[in-house]
A protein has these predicted regions:
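Accessory nucleic acid-recognition modules appended to NTPase machines
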Residues: 196-354
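Conserved lysine of the Walker
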Residues: 49-50
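Domain-level recognition of nuclease-like catalytic cores that cleave nucleotide substrates
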Residues: 394-415
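Hydrophobic anchor at the beta1->P-loop junction of P-loop NTPases
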Residues: 41
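Short glycine-rich substrate-engagement loop in P-loop NTPases that contacts/grips substrate
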Residues: 63-93
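Interdomain motor-coupling "hinge/lid" segment immediately C-terminal to the ATP-binding subdomain
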Residues: 2-14, 133-240
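A short, basic N-terminal segment
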Residues: 1-32
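Structural recognition of the conserved hydrophobic beta-strand(s) that form the central parallel beta-sheet
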Residues: 119-125, 146
Length: 415
């Protein structure tokens, strides 16, 4: 055990020696580390959770365990691990547990350490496992921080540009090129510095998530059906669907299995499902949901269709940005369809109050397109009694006044 933990310490020190981009979170690092609550950093695989945890603790005395290490898991013994940690890291003040969900019974061990007064930072890639088990044993004892792929702003910083200082994109071909790059290839940290490797890297990562995070964990026997469903949903991102429609389209014999697989695909933060807004929960649950992908790069890497759909790529980007800002599907983020079947892409809600309606349209230069998008958002605004109306575009900015409403048209770089 001592050899395993010593080797992990060497890996930790190598990781700490590398340069990193400081990510944007809503928390102050000093306040976080001072808190005795468990710091839970969640999100998809390979989005920088471990890096964020290391940066949080880099100037502090901390011990480190990496649960992606099969040797550690196979040799696991609670008392032996604790004894060895104390020997390898004398007088450590913090404990970093990386990808802790890989340890069977991790929640009981973490709960024990918490009662001992250990100040912990935990990372994990499984939304359901972490949320359910943390909620069961550690309610009110942890702070959750969600790490997603780089935002557009972070992508600009990586490329030595500042998005907030760009005032007129129309005069900057290089800035527009960066946005187009991000729109197509996404923001996974490992890919932003090596775009030629993006498709291969994300294809491999996607397959790893299907096999390691889902099929192996849930003991899925028909992995081919699971993979086909994942590929179908990624190919049809931003579109509404129901489990019955998916089962029929893919030739699955069981709608129940389809629903179960859909849930599995959500757990590792691969896909998100957005419900249609309705004040009646039962009606909302029955309506088709729209599917979104955690990063646009997965679309290029795994989608069936080779045809380009800039509008859907932009819509997916806006959805992930809303999630990054703290909105959650089913509680504060929805789509909406009016009684006349006019649709608004996103409804944000604060408590019981509808906060804003957001429509996404890549290009409004066509009068027909402009009329369709503006009429849709205004009709939905009337039904939902909302006056904060936004249309996000690739590169247009203006204010449109119609029927007593003001619709703000914003380019994606100002959203």
């Amino acid at each position: 055990m001592r050899t395993i933990i010593n080797n992990q310490k060497k890996e930790r020190d190598i990781l700490l020696s590398r340069p990193y981009l400081t990510r944007h979170t809503q928390y102050d690092v000093d306040e976080l580390t001072a808190s005795k609550q468990i710091k839970l950093i969640t999100g998809p695989r390979r989005t920088g959770k471990s890096t964020e945890a290391l940066l949080m603790l880099k100037d502090r005395n901390f011990a480190y365990l990496n649960f992606d290490d099969g040797k550690l898991l196979s040799a696991w013994d609670d008392d032996l691990v604790w004894e060895t940690l104390r020997a390898v890291y004398p007088d450590f003040e913090y404990l970093l547990l990386d990808e802790v969900q890989n340890l069977d019974g991790w929640d009981l061990w973490v709960s024990k350490l918490y009662r001992m007064g250990i100040n912990m930072v935990i990372t994990g890639s499984n939304a359901k496992l972490l949320s359910s088990e943390m909620a069961t044993l550690l309610t009110g004892r942890y702070i959750q921080i969600e790490m997603l792929p780089f935002s557009l702003s972070e992508f600009f910083i990586w490329n030595h540009r500042n998005l907030s200082e760009v005032s007129e994109m129309k005069d900057s071909a290089s800035d527009l090129s960066l946005i187009a790059d991000y729109l197509h290839h996404g923001g996974y940290p490992e890919t932003v510095a090596a775009r030629s490797l993006t498709q291969n890297y994300l294809s491999t990562l996607f397959d790893s998530i299907i096999w390691k995070d889902i099929a192996k964990r849930h003991k899925v026997r028909n992995v081919e059906d699971l993979n086909n469903l994942a590929m179908y949903l990624v190919s049809n991102f931003c579109n509404p669907f129901s489990a019955n429609e998916l089962a029929e389209a893919l030739g699955f014999s069981s709608v129940a299995t389809t629903k179960k697989f859909m849930g599995y695909l959500r757990e590792p933060y691969l896909l998100y499902y957005l419900p249609r807004y309705n004040n009646k929960l039962k009606v909302m649950k029955k309506a088709p949901q729209k599917v979104y992908v955690v990063d646009n790069g997965f679309v290029e890497a795994k989608a069936f269709s080779v045809s380009e759909n800039l509008g859907r790529l932009l819509e997916n980007q806006v959805f992930i940005e809303l999630v990054r800002r703290g909105y959650h599907a089913e509680t504060s983020l929805f789509y909406y369809r009016s009684r006349n079947d006019k649709e608004t892409d996103f409804v944000t809600r604060q408590g019981a109050h509808v906060e804003s309606l957001i429509q996404v349209c890549y290009d409004l230069s066509s009068e027909r397109t402009l009329k369709r998008e503006v009429d849709s958002i205004i009709e939905c605004a009337g039904e939902l009694k909302c006056s904060n109306l936004i249309i996000v575009t690739m590169n247009e900015e203006r204010v449109i006044e119609k029927n007593g409403y003001k619709v703000k048209v914003l380019p994606i770089y100002k959203f």
